[in-house]
C-alpha cells in the first residue's frame, strides 16, 4: 500500500482537512476504522500540526491509518472527559496573548500555560495586546516579573501596529500557536499579520465581561511569516493531570534555589530549611509563588479525587 504523509490543518467530528506534504494539496481525511489507534485513551486523537499516514481512495479523499510520533503537544485538562485534551502538536513557539486592560490580564492563566510550555519544551512568548487603550500599573508589574525570568514579553496594538514586526520575527520559519482567553484579540492580531486569514472578529461581550468565542476549532495555516495555529478563546486552562511532584521543575526561578533546600524532595511549601521560601521577595516573586501554591493545591486535590 502506497502511504502518503499529510499534515492536519483542522478537523471536527472525525473529519479532517489535511495537507499532502509533497503536492501541498488539501484533502478530506477520515479514519479507516471507527477510531484511530494511538495506544492510549485520548480526547483529541488528531489536532493541527499532527503528521499522519494515509492513502487516497477517491477524489481528494484519504483514509487516515496512522499518526506519526509527536515532538510535543500543547494540552490542557478537559474536566468533562477527565482527560488531557491536546490542542495543537509539533510547535516551536506559543504566543500567550493577553489584553492590557479588558479582559483583565490574569497571571494564573499565564503561569499554567508556562508550565505546559516548560514541560513540553515549547518556547513561550507573552503578548500584551491592546496597549493603545493604556496599560495599568498592575500589568506593567506582571510584565517586569516575566521579563526578569527570561521570558520574552511583547506589547502590541492592531491600531498602532506596535509590536507586529516583533511577532513576525518570532513566526519566521517556525510553527507558532496563538492562545489566550476570549476577547484578548488573537484573531485581530492574526488578521493583521496575514491579511488573507479570514478570521472573524467579534466585539467583547460587556454583559459577561468576557469575549465571544470567534475561533471555534484550532486551525493552522501557512502565512508569509511562518505557520500559524489559531486556537479557540479559552476560559480556563487546567493542568490537573500533571503529577503534583513535578510542578516545581516547571517554575524556572526555583532551579537556582532548590539545590540549596535541606531535602531533595522539598515541594517548597512548609518544609524546614527551604531555600525557595527564604528567597521570597529576593529572587523569587511573591506573585509567582502564590500562583505555584494555588496550582499545586489543584494538582493535589485532583490526585486525591482520582483515587
UniProtKB/Swiss-Prot annotation:
UniProt KW keywords: Cytoplasm, GTP-binding, Hydrolase, Metal-binding, Nucleotide-binding, Ribosome biogenesis, RNA-binding, rRNA-binding, Zinc
Residues that coordinate or bind Zn(2+): 261, 266, 268, 274
Disulfide bonds: none
GO BP of this protein: ribosomal small subunit biogenesis
Residue stretches spanning the membrane: none
EC number: 3.6.1.-
Location(s) in or outside the cell: Cytoplasm
GO MF term list: GTP binding; GTPase activity; metal ion binding; rRNA binding
InterPro entries in the cross-refs: G_CP_dom, P-loop_NTPase, Ribosome_biogen_GTPase_RsgA, RsgA_GTPase_dom
CP-type G domain span: 80-237
Pfam family membership, one: RsgA_GTPase
Top-rank lineage group of the source organism: Bacteria
CC annotations in GO: cytoplasm
Cofactor annotation comment: Binds 1 zinc ion per subunit.
Function comment: One of several proteins that assist in the late maturation steps of the functional core of the 30S ribosomal subunit. Helps release RbfA from mature subunits. May play a role in the assembly of ribosomal proteins into the subunit. Circularly permuted GTPase that catalyzes slow GTP hydrolysis, GTPase activity is stimulated by the 30S ribosomal subunit.
Assembly and binders: Monomer. Associates with 30S ribosomal subunit, binds 16S rRNA.
NCBIfam families the UniProt entry points to: ribosome small subunit-dependent GTPase A
Family indicated by similarity: Belongs to the TRAFAC class YlqF/YawG GTPase family. RsgA subfamily.
Listed name of the protein: Small ribosomal subunit biogenesis GTPase RsgA
The organism of origin for this protein: Borreliella afzelii (strain PKo) (Borrelia afzelii)
Lineage: Bacteria, Pseudomonadati, Spirochaetota, Spirochaetia, Spirochaetales
Gene for this chain: rsgA
